[in-house]
Amino acid sequence: MGAKEEYLENLKSFWPQNAPDISQVSKYVNKYKKEKIVIKCGGKVLIDPDLFDKFIEDVSVLHKLGLKVIIIHGGGPKIKTELAKLNIESEFINGLRVTDKKTMEVVEKALVDFNAEIVEKLSKKICKAEGLNVSTNNTIIVEQENKNLGFVGRPKKILNEKIQVVIDKHAIPVLSPMGKDDDSQKYNINADTAAAAVAKSLKSRRLLLMTDVEGVYDENKKLINEINPNEAKKLIDKKIVQGGMIPKLLNSIDAIENGVRGVVIIDGRKLHSILYEIFSDEGAGTLIRK
């Protein structure tokens, strides 16, 4: 058996069903093996057990192929459920959750618990991972976004060395979207904003933002496969995109203009969307790049 055949046989041992064509994988591995890939996990993936399991499986495949993956997870649906139990209603301004002290306590617990769950699930896939959260190992230095939003922070600095220590252990860093300011006050961060800040700081090759839609739509409600930052700005200016997609696009544009080669807003509801985005020309959403 030749080296190529042996490689494929090994790959088949962990390559999922209904994933992209296995014969094309090696060329994409060569493309990404020296790069970093930041993945923001959010939306329905967080609450649908099957989608969550597929997400964990996809990440473990990337790891087993030797790719450097960094995960930033959201917690919107879980936070919403916990707040509802306590009869706490959330207000949103431009897609960002207004966070008072009581809300902050709920947000922190939900995010820390979910962080631990992701690490545990990955370990069961024989995939070493390490949680980096605001309670035990803060990685994001923030400043307050604005007073109207309460305890919502904007990333000011990413402590790259903490992330690199985990990568050097051949483990996956799993980050919660929270940070501390210079006075150690904790702040909630929009998960897309946190992911973009990490991707910029690490100069990652790709940033994948998982959503509950196919990607970005044009004025005719058709999926846009690829778009550049200027075209993305026009979609916002013309109010073609609204709600939670606005911060996603703004963060994507910011990331592209600060060293990230490509940002993909991908459909997290599609099975193995991460593998289709990384290992095929088919993709799984909207690619934003220059």
PLM ranges: what are they?
Residues M1-R269, Y276, E282, R289-K290:
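Nucleotide/pyrophosphate-binding catalytic subdomain
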